[in-house]
Amino acid sequence: PMILLALGLLADTDIASLFTAITMDIGMCVTGLAAALITSSHLLRWVFYGISCAFFVAVLYVLLVQWPADAEAAGTSEIFGTLKILTVVLWLGYPILWALGSEGVALLSVGVTSWGYSGLDILAKYVFAFI
């Protein structure tokens, strides 16, 4: 949520759009966590994964369609565009890693999945903060 807050404030978006994006992000995280923690039904895990991905699509819509116009009007489109692309590209890695990793179809080992999440976390948060 903090990355979206920073991007929304940078784009000088309205509070309703900011609240919607952060709410969708929290929904994505909570349903993604539920998908990872459910052990009773593999199908139910994928249902929660799908719901999480639907929340993610809503977040992507805000980042890629709504906020760029706000950033243009605010005069911050260059830095917003850089941070937006960094965020979108790295965040796309999380659902892919979940699906291929030990929580999903288990094509990747637990270690590779864990290192993948760690790498995405470091890049998504620290590189974002550095820029």
Curated annotation (Swiss-Prot):
Gene3D superfamilies: Rhodopsin 7-helix transmembrane proteins. Its main location: membrane. One of its GO terms (biological process) is phototransduction. It is found in: Cell membrane. It is a multi-pass membrane protein. GO terms for molecular function: monoatomic ion channel activity; photoreceptor activity. This is Cruxhalorhodopsin-1. The gene is choP1.
